[in-house]
Amino acid sequence: MITPAPFPIGRPRRLRRDSFTRNLVRENTLTAHDFIYPVFVVEGQGQRVAVPSMPGVERLSLDLLLPVAQACVELEIPVMALFPVIDPSLKTYDGVEALNPDGLIPRVVRALKKEFPQLGIMTDVALDPFTSHGQDGLPDTRPENEGYILNDETTAILVQQALTQARAGVDIVAPSDMMDGRIGAIRQALEAEKLVHTRIMAYSAKYASAFYGPFRDAVGSASNLGKGNKKVYQMDPGNSDEALREVAMDIAEGADMVMVKPGMPYLDVVRRVKDQFKVPTFAYQVSGEYAMLMAAAQNGWLDREGVMLESLLAFKRAGADGVLTYFALDAARALRKA
């Protein structure tokens, strides 16, 4: 137990007296190296489509994404995370387009790694952008199991999706689907193909959250999902012990890094995971978190830069080693001028 000196011997405000002292004793800091920048990519040329529910975020074709990648390199943001916007005509029950070696994501990965080999590229392993029903896996078609997502059958497809991405040269595959056992299956498949340097960032504690709405708008899966939900595979927001079990399983199965999603509503989970496992731990400041802060800032209710940086610092204070954030570019620029 820490016993502070009693007042007036102890005056905590001494260490808040001026900026040099505050900088000297600051316990947690932000740098651009803490950020992973999620981006939405579409087919075509010259395509720039705003996401209305995420002010400032756009879906970009590859030619317009290249300057964004250049900005990440210049700002020293280490990783860009790709999320595809798939043509509705390619969406199927089984999401087979996710396995296309010449599909959108593999082509973008190859182009980015050719132009910017020093920039880390991360890809999403899940079927929801590719399925006609908007689920991350295969729905059970038996009437008595309506609404249930098949686990092992889905995992078999996810393994092939991860291999497709790894063969294209991606640095990090990030399974976000929450199927049981998928991390081990993916790791074994990568090892079998000698893709030993492909890292896995597991969405280990991904909650069935109400904060994902704008993201589903961005990737075009909201209309496919309709009134459906993902509660039979994503975690119950009331649970935190369960998160520790999920993380433990993923580490044992071969995950290099783990993630908690969403971020700010689950900072307690971030702290528990980091304290318990001492592994690289990340949080995702999801679309709903971003949209809330942007809406308040646009209405003049909050200072945009102030809440942006404070919210990101909160992740570091809670124990996160890094943050996936749509603020990455703006935050990196703000830190440079600070």
Regions found by a protein language model. Give the residues of each.
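Alpha/beta enzyme core
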Residues: 2-6, 18, 31-36, 42-338
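N-terminal amphipathic/basic leader segments beginning at the initiator methionine
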Residues: 1-26
